[in-house]
Amino acid sequence: MSLVPMVVEQTSRGERSYDIFSRLLKERIIMLSGEVNDDSSNLIVSQLLFLESEDPDKDISIYINSPGGSITAGMAIYDTMQYIKPDVSTICVGMAASMGAFLLSSGANGKRYALPNAEIMIHQPLGGFQGQATDIQIHANRILKIKESLNKILSENTNQPLEVIEADVERDNFMTADEAKTYGLVDKVITKNETGKDK
């Protein structure tokens, strides 16, 4: 069981309490922590759409501490980040691996950050299926198509040639924050909050 802290604020009408995530959302901050799955994806997509409706011209920040997870759930977040009008800045705290790293690299140009001790890992899609040989072949072909699509987007996000991405994701590829910056997964390694509310 995880505990969610409550934040109490004084207003002209008395005290008001929020859970910490609702209070952060009020500041246009979204947390992606833990596995990327349908539940976390639905929450993040909903928050992105809500914040766009609140103010389409103000940046949104997503803090990422995730080992990755479902590709389809992650692509729902990615597509929504590209679809909405506000710039979405991404900040890695702890670890961004697999789909977490993909989403980190997909933040707005110049607004992708990592804290100094963050770790980033990229690799190719994982999948497993059992059944008839033809069904296995169908699923294997699907994974290869997904791999090709993810590699193309990662190449665009990092400005790395596609052949470099294809070689580098063959196995788990771990990077420090500085290495991720050099590679093009993030734009800056930050020690103080530089994301800014109006940048």
Curated annotation (Swiss-Prot):
EC numbers for this chain: 3.4.21.92
Keywords from UniProt, A to Z, are: Cytoplasm, Hydrolase, Protease, Serine protease
Q: What InterPro entries would the database entry show?
A: ClpP, ClpP/crotonase-like_dom_sf, ClpP/TepA, ClpP_His_AS, ClpP_Ser_AS
Return the protein name.
Answer: ATP-dependent Clp protease proteolytic subunit
The compartments listed are:
Cytoplasm
GO biological process terms on file: protein quality control for misfolded or incompletely synthesized proteins
GO cellular-component terms in the record?
A: cytoplasm; endopeptidase Clp complex
HAMAP family assigned to the protein according to its UniProt record, in alphabetical order: ClpP
Catalytic residue positions: S98 (nucleophile), H123
Q: Which PANTHER family match?
A: ATP-DEPENDENT CLP PROTEASE PROTEOLYTIC SUBUNIT
Gene Ontology MF terms in the entry = ATP-dependent peptidase activity; ATPase binding; serine-type endopeptidase activity
One Pfam annotation reads: CLP_protease
Against Gene3D superfamilies, the record matches this protein to:
2-enoyl-CoA Hydratase, Chain A, domain 1 (3.90.226.10)
NCBIfam families, per database record: clpP, PRK00277.1, PRK12553.1
Instruction: Tell me, in a sentence or two, what this protein's role is.
Output: Cleaves peptides in various proteins in a process that requires ATP hydrolysis. Has a chymotrypsin-like activity. Plays a major role in the degradation of misfolded proteins.
**Catalyzed reactions:** Hydrolysis of proteins to small peptides in the presence of ATP and magnesium. alpha-casein is the usual test substrate. In the absence of ATP, only oligopeptides shorter than five residues are hydrolyzed (such as succinyl-Leu-Tyr-|-NHMec, and Leu-Tyr-Leu-|-Tyr-Trp, in which cleavage of the -Tyr-|-Leu- and -Tyr-|-Trp bonds also occurs)
Q: Which gene encodes it?
A: clpP
EC top class, as a word: hydrolase
How would you summarize the oligomeric state and partners of this protein? Fourteen ClpP subunits assemble into 2 heptameric rings which stack back to back to give a disk-like structure with a central cavity, resembling the structure of eukaryotic proteasomes.
Q: State the taxonomy lineage.
A: Bacteria, Bacillati, Bacillota, Clostridia, Eubacteriales
What family does this chain come from, according to its entry? Belongs to the peptidase S14 family.
Q: SUPFAM superfamilies of this UniProt entry?
A: ClpP/crotonase
